[in-house]
């Protein structure tokens, strides 16, 4: 059993990017789908889909590369962990590399980027940073 499924997801994406894989497959969960949705909306991944039957569903993430073969994901960092949760208010949401990256926040209105949460006046659990 994985103690931190979100960190496992980020590690699989990071390893897939370093190995220049086109697709990364991992066990699916609703939170992982929300994270993949935000990363797709922001252009870090090309797409995602849930495959398989209910008990053993898999999340397939299609990684995105430019014409030169460079990945759109330069780095991923887990912030809030099971042993130390990190919660932020609206004004405490960090800017990632001056706006080149995103912070992903789990709010009462769902999982969204830090800038979306800031515009809506929301805080929440700071899940990770992607740049």
UniProtKB/Swiss-Prot annotation:
Signal peptide boundaries: none
GO MF, any single term: rRNA binding
Task of the protein: One of the primary rRNA binding proteins, it binds directly to 16S rRNA central domain where it helps coordinate assembly of the platform of the 30S subunit.
Name this protein carries in UniProt: Small ribosomal subunit protein uS8
Name of the gene this protein is made from: rpsH
InterPro entries (UniProt xref): Ribosomal_uS8, Ribosomal_uS8_sf
GO cellular component: ribonucleoprotein complex; ribosome
HAMAP family from the UniProt entry: Ribosomal_uS8_B
Pfam annotation, one family: Ribosomal_S8
Sorted UniProt keywords: Ribonucleoprotein, Ribosomal protein, RNA-binding, rRNA-binding
Summary of subunit composition and partner proteins: Part of the 30S ribosomal subunit. Contacts proteins S5 and S12.
GO BP terms in the entry: translation
Disulfide bond annotation, renumbered to this chain: none
Assigned protein family: Belongs to the universal ribosomal protein uS8 family.
Record-linked PANTHER family: 40S RIBOSOMAL PROTEIN S15A (PTHR11758)
Domain of life, source organism: Bacteria
């Amino acid at each position: 059993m994985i103690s931190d499924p979100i960190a496992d997801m980020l590690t699989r994406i990071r390893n897939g990017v370093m190995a220049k894989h086109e697709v990364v497959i991992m066990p699916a969960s609703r939170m992982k789908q929300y994270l993949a949705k935000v990363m797709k909306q922001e252009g870090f991944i090309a797409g995602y889909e849930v495959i398989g039957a209910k008990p053993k569903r898999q999340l397939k993430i299609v990684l995105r590369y430019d014409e030169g073969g460079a990945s759109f994901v330069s780095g991923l960092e887990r912030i809030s962990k099971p042993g130390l949760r990190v919660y932020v208010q609206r004004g405490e949401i960090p800017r990632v590399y001056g706006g080149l990256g995103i912070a992903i926040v789990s709010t009462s209105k769902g999982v969204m980027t830090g800038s979306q949460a800031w515009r809506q006046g929301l805080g929440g659990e700071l899940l990770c940073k992607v740049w």
